[in-house]
């Protein structure tokens, strides 16, 4: 979506929202990695509101996700996590959304931004992050029993992908026929594994998936460590196994650090620093053996769903082409060799 179209959509959304305050200036804050556009609206009373314009994916799943997000925020009120998730501006008792049939806009509270973690975390910070995310996951697990069931899952997403490359004569847009065979085989193997491990009966909690350092802030106390303060950006929010959060958490924990030029390599899942993260997480919210063994499959799901299936619609075109080509040439062919059993042993779960 280009800037002019996004600004027009945001202006129309603000008019429909019906707030009497006027927008004096719309300051773009987009990361320019995805096709979404994000703006900070400066209002005539000196306050600010965040607006996101998008045409990525399905509006109806977007609407469902934001209903769930709003419910999660309400359920976390009164807990340590009250105010952590940037709120969605409501109208008539529901999260407000503007939709014109082709694109959509949502308005968010401009939450206070605390300190950003450094691009490469110290080992104590990695361990602290493990404890903090574990605490957040526990709160989300408690809230999850009061949320409606989601309409999509890992299984349904992979069935949709497999249907799009269902025969040898059909290729994904932007990928060749041989690439389609790599995707088809990898998605089929994942679906077989989901069935074997009975993932439908695993606990499902609200998860955010994309834990890059630009999406959350922290506050440091007088002693060592920090507390997660605020979180924004919900592009990949879903209700699913907590294990889908861990690939990005391995990236944040990595010695590679948060980089402006990046790939979606699985190597971060097997660094000692991620094991330190897992140990700290496990002390607060114990993991099961099956969950840890699922980590390579969670990584495979990320690549298949967010890079291959949705990548052309979500990422900037030059990034989408590179990420998808890396996926089919390197990451998916090598995914079968990924083995989480050393992590299981290190956590004492063998």
Predicted regions and their residues:
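An alpha-helical support segment within catalytic cores of ATP-dependent transferases
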Residues: 8-19, 145, 166-209, 219-223
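A cross-family kinase active-site recognition segment
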Residues: 119-178, 204
């Amino acid at each position: 979506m280009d800037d002019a179209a996004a600004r027009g959509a945001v202006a129309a959304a603000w008019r429909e929202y019906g707030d009497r305050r006027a927008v004096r200036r719309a300051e773009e804050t987009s990361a320019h990695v995805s096709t979404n556009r994000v703006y900070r609206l400066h209002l005539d009373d000196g306050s600010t509101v965040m607006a996101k314009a998008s045409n990525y994916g399905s509006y109806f799943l977007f609407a469902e996700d934001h209903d769930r997000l709003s419910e999660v925020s309400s359920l976390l009120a009164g807990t340590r996590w009250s105010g952590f998730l940037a709120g969605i501006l409501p109208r008539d008792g529901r999260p407000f959304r503007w939709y014109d049939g082709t694109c959509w806009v949502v308005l968010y509270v401009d939450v206070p931004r605390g300190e950003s973690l450094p691009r490469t975390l110290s080992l104590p910070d990695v361990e602290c992050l493990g404890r903090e995310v574990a605490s957040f996951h526990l709160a989300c697990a408690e809230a999850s029993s009061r949320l409606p069931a989601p309409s999509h899952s890992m299984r349904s997403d992979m069935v949709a992908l497999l249907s799009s490359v269902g025969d040898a004569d059909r290729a994904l847009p932007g990928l060749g026929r041989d690439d389609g065979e790599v995707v088809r085989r990898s998605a089929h193997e994942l679906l077989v594994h989901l069935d074997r491990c009975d993932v439908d009966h695993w606990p499902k909690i609200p998860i955010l998936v994309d834990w890059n350092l630009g999406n959350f802030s922290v506050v440091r106390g007088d002693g060592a460590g920090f507390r997660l303060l605020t979180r924004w950006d919900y592009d990949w929010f879903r209700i699913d196994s907590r294990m889908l959060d861990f690939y990005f958490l391995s990236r944040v924990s990595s010695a590679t650090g948060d980089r402006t030029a990046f790939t979606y390599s699985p190597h971060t899942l097997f660094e000692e620093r991620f094991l330190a993260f897992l140990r700290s997480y496990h002390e607060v919210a114990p993991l099961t053996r099956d969950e840890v063994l699922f980590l390579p499959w969670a990584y495979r799901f990320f690549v298949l769903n967010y890079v291959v299936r949705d990548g052309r619609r979500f990422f900037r075109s030059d990034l989408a082409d590179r990420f998808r080509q890396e996926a089919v040439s390197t990451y998916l062919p090598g995914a079968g060799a990924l083995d989480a059993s050393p992590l299981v042993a290190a956590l004492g779960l063998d």
